[in-house]
Design a protein with these regions (language model features):
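Cytosolic regulatory regions built on CNB/CRP/Popeye-like sensor folds
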Residues: 1-115
Length: 115
C-alpha cells in the first residue's frame, strides 16, 4: 500500500502522521497536491491567515519571525500546521532559499483528517 506522496515523501516518517494506519496514510497521500516553488518565493507570511499545511519534498527554506531568521527547513520537514489547526495567523514568514518541491494539504482536508 502506497504511503508516499507523488514526489516520494514517506508520510509515515512525518511526525504529525506517524500514528496513522497505512490506510489513513494512503488517503492523506491522495489529498496532497505537489507544487514547484522558485527560489525566493514566499511560502507563508507572518500575520496572515493559514490555509495550507506543507511538507518539503526537496529544496530548502528559511523561517523568519519579525525579520530575524530563526530556523532553516529541509526535505521531510513540514510547516503551516499551527495556523491550520488553530485558525490563528501564521507565526512566521517562510521563504524558499532554493528551488523547492512541496506537498500541500488545504485546511479543510487537513481538519477532516483530524476528526
Amino acid at each position: 500500500m502506497v504511503t508516499k506522496t507523488s514526489s516520494g515523501v514517506d508520510l509515515a516518517e512525518i511526525g504529525i502522521f506517524s500514528e496513522l494506519s497505512k490506510r489513513e496514510l494512503k488517503a492523506v497521500s491522495r489529498l496532497m497536491t505537489e507544487l514547484t516553488i522558485k527560489e525566493g518565493a514566499t511560502l507563508t507570511r507572518q500575520g496572515e491567515p493559514g490555509r495550507e499545511f506543507m511538507i518539503i519534498s526537496s529544496g530548502t527554506a528559511k523561517v523568519e519571525i519579525d525579520g530575524q531568521t530563526v530556523a532553516h527547513l529541509a526535505p521531510g520537514e513540514f510547516l503551516g500546521e499551527l495556523a491550520v489547526i488553530s485558525g490563528t495567523p501564521r507565526t512566521a514568514t517562510v521563504t524558499a532559499t532554493s528551488p523547492m518541491i512541496i506537498e500541500i494539504l488545504n485546511r479543510r482536508e487537513f481538519m477532516a483528517l483530524l476528526d
